[in-house]
């Protein structure tokens, strides 16, 4: 029951993932981080079986670091997405990973952020917005209506609010906590989005 979605703004990209780890109808933990920082300016959000996500994510992270040490430079976001897609394709008919990915990054040379959508069948596409799991099911229509090029951070925060509210409206047992991660020229930044705390704060504000 993963909720993962993301989009690009004005020289930054946002990736949101829920924090719940579930097995059938049991919640094992509510502080799971479903994103992995590949380097200082790239992150990858994954949905699928946890074993596949952890193993594949750490494999990509380690090999990108090895490339950096050997060659003295980091992969661009496009190159990182191509490498990740190639690894999914090579393993598809040998030992496939059931991993769906959103890969976001910022490239200083181009002075822009980008987002790549990949699925477990090794398709890869550069997108302005996308999602996996219930994030993909319920948020794409909101992206069609509210996403716009060069979004400001205030507009991006408002769009994140809309997407999470839609997920909570549609799902009977919707996650209450999300990691909101932004990647820009200064690196990656993480914020915990707690729906219960936000509702309590809204009630306090209305009471005043």
Describe the predicted segments one by one.
Residues 1-208:
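Long, low-complexity N-terminal extensions
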